[in-house]
A protein has these predicted regions:
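Short, acidic/small-residue loops that bind anionic groups at enzyme active sites
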Residues: 131-141
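Structural beta-alpha unit
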Residues: 12, 72-109
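General small-molecule cofactor/ligand-binding pocket signal
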Residues: 32-34, 85-89, 137-139
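Short secondary-structure boundary segments
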Residues: 35-36, 112-114, 140-141
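Glycine-rich, Arg-bearing micro-motifs that act as flexible, cationic patches
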Residues: 108-131
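A short acidic, glycine-rich active-site loop
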Residues: 51-66
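Small/aliphatic-rich secondary-structure junction motif
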Residues: 1-53, 76, 131
Length: 141
């Protein structure tokens, strides 16, 4: 059993990561931080015009590094108390989250939800709510 949290390439995921970590500690289970990235090669923001394109392995490594950094930034010193793994998936975000939740036997899936004017759930949240194999918790960004 695990707790899965969706992580975006923005600081907005911090609250979701913190809450997911609390849930993982409470449930005495592993936190799995998931980031989806485009299946096309060379998606990284590090790629500039004229720079060499990245391979798929490079893309995965960059996404995993971003995930580790996001968890570390969100949890600070508390990251040492939480057992966590990172999973980078070359797919659409909703499908990636549901797939990881299924394969990792998730007890809970945590997502950052839109706030402000965009309080309506986005397409990723809608997909996850319809297809997740476990309860879904949305956290305001």
């Amino acid at each position: 059993m695990t707790v899965v949290v969706g992580v975006k390439q923005s600081p907005d995921s911090r609250a979701a990561i913190r809450l997911a970590a609390q849930e993982a500690l409470y449930r005495d289970t592993t936190l799995i931080a998931v980031m989806a990235y485009p299946a096309e090669r060379g998606w990284s923001p590090a790629v500039r015009p004229g720079a060499e394109r990245l391979t798929r392995a490079d893309d995965r490594t960059i996404a995993e590094d971003l995930l580790h950094q996001a968890v570390s930034d969100a949890l600070g010193d508390a990251a040492e108390r939480v057992e966590y793994r990172v999973v980078a998936v070359a797919d659409l975000a909703g499908r990636a989250l549901v797939h990881v939740a299924q394969t990792e036997d998730a007890q809970l899936l945590v997502l950052a939800a839109r706030s402000g004017i965009a309080k309506v759930l986005g397409t990723v949240s809608q997909y996850v709510l319809r297809n997740a194999p476990c309860p879904v918790l949305t956290v305001p960004e």
